[in-house]
A protein has these predicted regions:
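Short, well-ordered alpha-helical scaffold segments within catalytic/effector domains
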Residues: 12, 55, 67, 122-129
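Catalytic cores of large soluble enzymes that bind and process phosphate-bearing ligands
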Residues: 3, 36, 40, 116-120, ...
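Signal for well-folded cores of large energy- and translation-related assemblies
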Residues: 16, 34, 49, 66, ...
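Short glycine-/acidic-enriched loop or helix-start segments at secondary-structure transitions
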Residues: 70, 95, 152-154
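Cys/His-rich Zn2+-binding cysteine-cluster or related metal-binding knuckle/ribbon modules and their
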Residues: 2-8, 17, 27-92
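Extended interfacial segments that mediate partner engagement and assembly in macromolecular machines
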Residues: 26, 75-141
């Protein structure tokens, strides 16, 4: 007969609420915390509380930051006429790692999803529209994932902005570097051909 440890289960349950953490991983994380010294556990708990208290949305681009305005919006060398729209801060960080993009961003904090009842009012679309209307924006690059939700979000943004004369583009997607054509699905191949560029 297995004996449960209520405090451990409660801790694992809280870890299980984190995105992408299953029951087994949650339990492993709970055991890791139990194995910490009391001082380490206090620092861990304080780091969580500190992040929760100090991290907020940048008032300009909605990126997560612990400053008044995020470092990207504060950077005067950035091209402010181009906005790259992303679903979340993780996507922004992935683009920044490439170091190829020199414009600014707008973080939606989600994507449209009728199946999950996520409407334009549930994400930071109003802030994007207001920003485009009040700033000298020449191009909006939509960099949402190539999923049904990402495509729906991209199409919705395009329909809102194009009538205002804003150039709206979508990042290309297709065959990854090192990928083999025979393993690509029809949609990926079609996107690769549609997103082709002169060589």
């Amino acid at each position: 007969m297995s004996e449960s440890i209520k405090s451990l289960e409660l801790l694992a349950e809280q870890f299980g609420k984190l995105g992408g953490v299953g029951k087994r991983t949650a339990m492993r994380l709970a055991f890791s915390v139990v194995d910490m010294t009391e001082a380490e556990a206090e620092r861990f708990a304080e780091a969580i509380l500190e992040a929760k208290r100090n991290i907020h949305c940048c008032p300009v681009c909605q990126n997560l930051t612990d400053l008044e305005v995020c470092p990207i919006c504060s950077d005067t060398t950035r091209d402010r006429s181009t906005i790259c729209v992303v679903a979340d801060t993780r996507s922004l960080m992935a683009i920044e790692k490439v170091c190829e993009y020199g414009g600014v961003y707008h973080v939606l904090h989600g994507m449209l999803s009728p199946m999950q009842n996520i409407t334009p009012d549930d994400i930071k679309l109003r802030e994007l529209i207001e920003r485009v209307a009040s700033e000298d924006i020449r191009e909006v690059i939509i960099a949402t994932n190539p999923t049904t939700e990402g495509e729906a979000t991209a199409m919705y943004i395009s329909r809102l902005l194009k009538p205002a004369g804003i150039k709206v583009t979508r990042i290309a997607n297709g065959i990854p570097v090192g990928g083999e054509l025979e393993f690509a699905d029809a949609h990926t191949l079609a996107c690769a051909f549609d997103g082709r560029k002169e060589y």
